[in-house]
Swiss-Prot record:
Residues 42-45, 148-164, 225-235, 299-301, 344-364, 408-429, 487-644 are cytoplasmic. One of its GO terms (biological process) is regulation of intracellular pH. Belongs to the monovalent cation:proton antiporter 1 (CPA1) transporter (TC 2.A.36) family. The keyword Nucleotide-binding does not apply. This is Sodium/hydrogen exchanger 9. Keywords: Antiport, Cell membrane, Cytoplasmic vesicle, Endosome, Ion transport, Membrane, Sodium, Sodium transport, Transmembrane, Transmembrane helix, Transport. Its main location: membrane.
Amino acid sequence: MERQRRFMSEKDEYQFQHQGAVELLVFNFLLILTILTIWLFKNHRFRFLHETGGAMVYGLIMGLILRYATAPTDIESGTVYDCGKLAFSPSTLLINITDQVYEYKYKREISQHNINPHLGNAILEKMTFDPEIFFNVLLPPIIFHAGYSLKKRHFFQNLGSILTYAFLGTAISCIVIGLIMYGFVKAMVYAGQLKNGDFHFTDCLFFGSLMSATDPVTVLAIFHELHVDPDLYTLLFGESVLNDAVAIVLTYSISIYSPKENPNAFDAAAFFQSVGNFLGIFAGSFAMGSAYAVVTALLTKFTKLCEFPMLETGLFFLLSWSAFLSAEAAGLTGIVAVLFCGVTQAHYTYNNLSLDSKMRTKQLFEFMNFLAENVIFCYMGLALFTFQNHIFNALFILGAFLAIFVARACNIYPLSFLLNLGRKHKIPWNFQHMMMFSGLRGAIAFALAIRDTESQPKQMMFSTTLLLVFFTVWVFGGGTTPMLTWLQIRVGVDLDEDLKERPSSHQEANNLEKSTTKTESAWLFRMWYGFDHKYLKPILTHSGPPLTTTLPEWCGPISRLLTSPQAYGEQLKEDDAECIVNQDELAMNYQEQAASPCSPPTRLGLDQKAAPQTPGKENIYEGDLGLGGYELKLEQTPGQSQLN
């Protein structure tokens, strides 16, 4: 009897390991297919279906196979046993079965209407990820890469517009979607499709907050390939990066909104408490991420880690990851922390790294971002069939489609009108139309929706979110190139040539009476540049003027301690260096790169310019169109473009 029991236990353990291997193998094959498809698309210059859309297609096919080609394997999984002596759910439970004690761990709470779907298919159950995997493993590399690869010159030049779209625009989208969905919910109650009280207004606002998270990864990838006008790219990229962080904190704030009396009534105290939570969590997460980046910058500045690039890269990665984990452990939002950690690391720490570490960190996070994004989009396709508690309601889905388009319009057009009143460099109508078109939903909305699927309203939200992501990625992502052509938006813009048309921030700071900036945030940019140039850069990096020349005399000992020896022989370049440089720039030792003690002495002088590279025919079709000012025209041959 004992031998049989041990045999059954070993068999169950082996079966569990087998299912885990099958799960990893499925995702491995999906990623292999996705990579081969990406190569095929790039080789044939096919832009009407992005790699994320292809990953979703493969996920759908695999989910369809798993759903209908696998048989039920676990009959006992849906059986409910009563434990009358337990008044709460313990984290671990020891159960004595025929004189053998087994340990079980708490997994999640299951509603009464979700018990029946648990009868049966263990493979489908295994293929349903723990939602925390998305937030703790897959999303941090994506968000960090967004901050680390930020082109800060254009970002700061459009800072006011980006903040307006990200904060005020997200709030507008949340409220508009919530109001429209509340109207449709009332119609569903009137039609008998919902019971009165199943869906509260706070649930509609919760859905509005998660659907306000835009993720135009498909559009931005095509923009990058075609070298679209940098202002449009920066506005859309900056909005999407900050919008993700705002939407996550906003979703959490709405979820903890709890009026004392009626959950469907407005409570001023609970409302202001939620607003306070939003501001406190966002500010705390920002401070946490920035603090870890400052610590990393100081460590890389005052140690000789640059002599050991492997150790330097490892420390950089672990401290960046610690920003996320520390924020989560402190009850803050790790996604916001890791975003601003990436931005600050790019601005300061990157300048202290050796050339090897610069290349390694850039490639490491670019690779992690690529894998994480494709795993999420593959899983989206899988989840349509492997998730066993879908609730599809035609009226709710119709309302959601209408709501996201109306909310996007209420976000972009009124805010652009207000911003243009104060901007010298206006946001043209074709930019506004493109931003309206680019309001795709993606990884963030999906991750927020799947985090809680226990109640029927949350299951309906999750199922609807999946359909919205599929539609926007396939339709809007695939229509990006034709839309650029129709709106006559510049492509092939050389960033360096575009920047020559605008005065640098340093020149603006020295010639305030002579010239007026073309950017709406110039005064803020000048103030920040001056403070950063005189104090922060010299403290945290090897560049900038010596602190002995900028701090008061009584700070002499501290100034000498914090000033790098390289600062006495180096002057900060007139134009602030870009955060991330590409391989060609690293190869020629980019002229605006800050001093690093481990960098080779060879560098371009201040008055030297790299020879311009004339793009060949292949590069033109790939999107590297040279000098810019062109309009994209579609040829008769699909997937190709010509220049005007």
